[in-house]
A protein has these predicted regions:
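Short Pro/Gly-enriched beta-strand edge/turn motifs at strand-loop
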Residues: 2-15, 116-124
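Catalytic core of the metallo-beta-lactamase
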Residues: 25-27, 37, 108-169
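Metallo-beta-lactamase
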Residues: 91-135, 221-241
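Conserved beta-strand hairpin/beta-sheet module of binuclear metal-dependent hydrolase folds
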Residues: 5-54, 134-150
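Active-site neighborhood of phospho(di)ester-bond hydrolases with catalytic His/Asp-centered motifs
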Residues: 37-41, 61-69, 90-93, 148-152, ...
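Active-site metal-binding motif and surrounding structural segment of the metallo-beta-lactamase
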Residues: 45-90, 165-175, 196
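Cap/insert and terminal regions of metallo-dependent hydrolase folds
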Residues: 73-76, 145-146, 152-231
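Structural motif
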Residues: 5-8, 35-36, 63, 87-89, ...
């Protein structure tokens, strides 16, 4: 377990003043002993610019994580390759060509996998009709539980949260943050039954954000491009929004 986890939102659809943004999602993760990147937006230039504004060094990354193959999550990885050539990136099945061509080292995840001592992949879940294989990242924070970072949640954000808990041998999850892909209220209700904090971003949609904010105000947390969240045993605290 880590004592704390800090999340720097490099890109979300909504930017804070002074940041650049487009449709995409990317988070720089920092914990005691490692730094990683979860997804990488659409644009290398936006990743580089916002990393500079947030004061994070892409060259210090130790590993990367790609939730699924859509370009608004992987298109900025050339910037990562420039800063950290040969970086190991955990990817779902079928997602190796672009990463390798950009000079990164794709590692295909076929099931629940520890990617660091205190971080694990849920393993890929299928979205059924769409045929998209997507996995989520879970980090165990001491005294709190699992922080689950999702990309677009094509298989369902509730299913990804359940898979994270199952992979970690936990009863539930503490925090879920990322794109929820326009979820139904029933999906959000199920998520609220297993998560203490819910942070919808990216493709979640304004209706989902408002539903969580008004129906579960004690569980809601917000983030956008430029946000910095510190997560420890007390839960997520927004250091910068």
């Amino acid at each position: 377990m880590v004592g704390w986890l800090r999340l720097y939102v490099l890109d979300d659809n909504e930017p804070a003043p002074g940041f650049r943004s487009e449709w995409g999602w990317s988070v720089y993760l920092e914990a005691p002993g490692w730094r990683a990147i979860f997804d990488a937006d659409t644009s290398p230039s936006i990743i580089e610019y916002n990393a500079g504004e947030l004061g994070v060094d892409l060259g210090r990354l130790e590993w990367g994580f790609l939730s699924h193959h859509h370009y608004d999550h992987k298109g900025g990885y050339p910037a990562i390759a420039r800063a950290r050539p040969g970086l190991r990136v955990y990817v779902p099945p079928g997602e190796t060509g672009d990463m390798a061509s950009w000079g990164l080292e794709p590692v295909v995840v076929k099931g629940p996998t520890r990617v660091a001592g205190d971080a694990l992949s849920t393993g890929p879940l299928s979205s059924g009709l769409w045929g998209i294989e997507e996995h989520a990242l879970a980090v165990e924070v001491e005294g709190l539980g699992l922080v689950v970072i999702v990309g677009c949640s094509h298989p369902g954000v509730d299913r990804l949260a359940e898979a994270a808990a199952r992979a970690a041998g936990a009863r539930g999850v503490a925090v879920v943050i990322g794109g929820f892909h326009g979820p139904s209220r029933a999906t959000l209700d199920r998520l609220a039954g297993m998560a203490r904090w819910i942070c919808p971003t990216h493709c979640s949609g304004s209706e989902a954000k408002e539903y969580v904010r008004t129906t579960y105000p004690d569980k809601y947390c917000a983030a956008r491009t430029g946000s910095v969240l510190q997560v420890d045993r007390d839960g997520p605290a927004l250091e910068r929004y």
